[in-house]
């Protein structure tokens, strides 16, 4: 999806998601909380800076701030309308557009890209990973989340969601290849097995990560420690 398309839907983004998800979308924060907690589980809670790449209207940023209260949390997106809403909902957070500002090289301990790549044309995905790589500090992490195309319910939701009208879902194997090209793979698995209505079963998710039926999957990669970061004081929160 291009920047103008995201701008078109920014004001009604959450409402569109709720309508597309139906009974699965009654608590959108549930999904943001689950992602943020999984990120914390993978990288620990002592990082100095976290960027959400493709932050939209900032829903995940709010949850990341709760999970990483001592870290600087930032967000970037192509959609200026979405960024405007994100700033209004998350005062004090730095949001920026990659179309207007250069990437902050080596600026973050972790870059999280939740459900971004399926909106990117397949022949442009390597470039996105390259951009994220430049923004991650040596020893830092990339963490991506993507819809699982092998889940029939996910495919139905994506098919009926205006936000995903140009989406091209990618399987875990493709995401692993994309991340492996620039990072050392650290973790991957399936997640989002239980919607809000049965959230009491979510404690089972770690034992199901191997099962390719989850609504989404995650991949974590680590940037080589021997690389040299070029700039930024993002990791030093004062």
List the predicted regions and their residue ranges.
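Conserved class I S-adenosyl-L-methionine
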Residues: 1-43, 47-56
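A conserved beta-strand element that flanks and buttresses the S-adenosyl-L-methionine
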Residues: 112
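A short glycine-rich, Lys/Arg-flanked "PGG" loop and its adjoining helix->strand segment in the class I
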Residues: 126-138
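A C-terminal cap/extension of S-adenosyl-L-methionine-dependent methyltransferases
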Residues: 141, 186-238
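Acceptor-substrate binding/catalytic loop of class I
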Residues: 158-174
């Amino acid at each position: 999806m291009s920047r103008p398309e995201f701008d078109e839907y920014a004001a009604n983004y959450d409402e569109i998601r709720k309508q597309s998800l139906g009974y699965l979308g009654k608590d959108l924060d549930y999904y943001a909380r689950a992602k943020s907690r999984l990120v914390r589980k993978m990288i620990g809670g002592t990082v100095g800076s976290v960027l959400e790449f493709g932050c939209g209207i900032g829903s995940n940023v709010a949850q990341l701030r709760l999970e990483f209260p001592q870290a600087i949390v930032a967000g970037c997106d192509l959609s200026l309308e979405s960024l405007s809403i994100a700033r209004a909902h998350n005062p004090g957070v730095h949001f920026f557009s990659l179309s207007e500002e250069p990437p902050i090289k080596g600026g973050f301990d972790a870059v999280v890209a939740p459900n971004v790549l399926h909106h990117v044309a397949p022949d442009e995905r390597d470039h996105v990973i390259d951009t994220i790589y430049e923004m991650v500090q040596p020893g830092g992490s990339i963490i991506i989340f993507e819809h699982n195309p092998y889940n029939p319910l996910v495919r139905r939701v994506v098919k009926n969601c205006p936000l995903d009208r140009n989406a091209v879902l990618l399987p875990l194997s493709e995401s692993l290849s994309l991340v492996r090209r620039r990072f050392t793979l650290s973790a991957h698995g399936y997640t989002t097995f239980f919607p809000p209505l049965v959230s009491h079963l979510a404690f089972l998710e770690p034992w199901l990560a191997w099962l390719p039926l989850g609504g989404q999957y995650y991949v974590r990669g680590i940037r080589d420690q021997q690389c040299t970061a070029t700039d930024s004081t993002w990791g030093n929160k004062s």
